[in-house]
From Swiss-Prot:
SUPFAM superfamilies, per database record: NadA-like (SSF142754)
Keywords: 4Fe-4S, Cytoplasm, Iron, Iron-sulfur, Metal-binding, Pyridine nucleotide biosynthesis, Transferase
Family of the protein in this entry: Belongs to the quinolinate synthase family. Type 3 subfamily.
Listed pathway(s): Cofactor biosynthesis; NAD(+) biosynthesis; quinolinate from iminoaspartate: step 1/1
Protein name: Quinolinate synthase
NCBIfam families: nadA (TIGR00550), PRK09375.2-1 (NF006880), PRK09375.2-4 (NF006883)
Catalytic activity of the protein: iminosuccinate + dihydroxyacetone phosphate = quinolinate + phosphate + 2 H2O + H(+)
List of residues binding [4Fe-4S] cluster: 110, 230, 320
Function, in words: Catalyzes the condensation of iminoaspartate with dihydroxyacetone phosphate to form quinolinate.
Cofactor(s) this protein cannot do without: [4Fe-4S] cluster
Single Gene Ontology MF annotation: metal ion binding
Source organism per UniProt: Bacillus cereus (strain Q1)
Gene: nadA
Length: 368
């Protein structure tokens, strides 16, 4: 038998044996590996992850928080990121070259991030430059690919989060007359409106038709919104709010700004994931809340606050499907391959893309 025949190929899809393991055995193995590896292993877990995954997280938070925490951890060799692809990309860009970022399931993407690819964006920028010249600055939500962050970096722009969007949009208007906001039109619209920019000064760029959607004199345009959205938050409607108002008139309604403008306008409060968590945490016992955000997080908030009446704004809401791809079997698989000295599902961003994307990230980080 030759040496080549003895080498076993590294599996790239979840092996069948993980489907037959009991939850108890999987949890036991995860704990064993975590204890064995100690500080060499770091597991960040996004707020939208399942409880079966979050229970093993060394840190929980939103995408940028987790990337920053990972970057500040210089001891860990392996960062097993329990989130979606763009989050792991950001972690890879902010960590050192000798740290390895792993995504337990490479199918864990983000439909919103995928709504703006670099070819579409370069083409749009070229067309918009014909219309507006050098009067625009691009901002991208951190929920975007590394390539889009890099595009913003090399064009003088920056990244934003739902927590600091107002600060970053305000900064953008000190740089240029117009703003191009990618890839979530709703966060861009809600933020700009909150800063006093009228809706009739906002246009939408449709990447599928390569056209600007706007009725009126284009010289009046201040904000150009990319036609993208979050598939989860898009499902909250004004009708949901009307139903809550009718059946529970004393219930507070709080939503994420990835919801559409009409939903945000009709709600009592709107803010980032952290804002929602903090608001419920500080609310008095006995208060009532309908929350418009991802279902795994809503369920976790309900469990953490039994003294409050909390429901999802949309009773038929499902968890984020791509976030849900990261589960206990995939987490254990990733950890066991590391234990064997193998590396699967490694996230590695091109160096030039990293340099330009980090420009955009740093322009944000130095201002917030």
């Amino acid at each position: 038998m030759s040496i080549l025949e003895k080498v076993q190929p590294i599996e790239t899809m979840l092996p069948e044996r993980y489907y037959t393991m009991s939850t108890e055995n999987m949890e036991k193995r995860v704990r064993e590996i975590k204890e064995k590896m100690g500080g060499k292993l770091f597991i960040p877990g996004h707020h939208y992850q399942k409880d079966e995954v979050v229970q093993f997280s060394d840190a929980a938070g939103d995408s940028l928080q987790l990337a920053q925490v990972a970057a500040s951890n210089k001891e860990a060799k392996y960062i097993v990121f329990c989130g979606v692809h763009f989050m792991a990309e950001t972690a890879d860009m902010l960590t050192t070259d000798d740290q390895i970022v792993i995504l337990p399931d490479m199918r864990a993407g983000c439909s919103m991030a995928d709504m703006a690819d670099i070819e579409q964006t370069e083409r749009a920028w070229k067309e918009l430059m014909k219309l507006f010249g050098d009067t625009m600055i691009p901002l991208t939500y951190v929920n975007s690919t590394a390539a889009i962050k890099a595009f913003c970096g090399r064009n003088g722009g920056a990244t934003v989060t739902s927590s600091n969007a107002k600060q970053m949009v305000s900064w953008a208007f000190t740089q240029k007359e117009r703003l191009v906001f990618l890839p979530d039109q709703h966060l861009g619209r809600n933020t700009a409106y909150d800063l006093g920019i009228p809706l009739d000064k906002m246009a939408v760029w449709d990447p599928h038709t390569d056209s600007l959607e706007y009725d009126g004199d284009i010289e009046e345009i201040q904000v150009i919104l990319w036609k993208g959205h979050c598939s989860v938050h898009q499902n909250f409607t004004v009708k949901n709010i009307e139903n809550v108002r009718k059946n529970h008139p004393d219930m507070n309604i709080i939503v994420h700004p990835e919801c559409c403008y009409e939903v945000v306008a009709a709600s009592d409060y709107a803010g980032s994931t952290k804002y929602i968590i903090d608001m419920i945490e500080s609310a008095p016992s006995g208060s009532k809340w309908a929350i418009g955000t991802e279902m795994n997080l809503v369920n976790r908030i309900i469990q953490q606050h039994p003294d409050k009446e909390i429901v999802s704004l949309n009773p038929f809401m499902c968890p984020c499907l791509t976030m849900n791809r990261i589960d206990l079997p995939h987490l254990l698989w990733a950890l066991e391959t590391i234990e064997r000295g193998e590396e699967i599902n490694v996230i590695s961003v091109d160096k030039q893309v990293t340099e330009e994307a980090v420009l955009a990230l740093n322009r944000m980080l130095e201002r917030v």
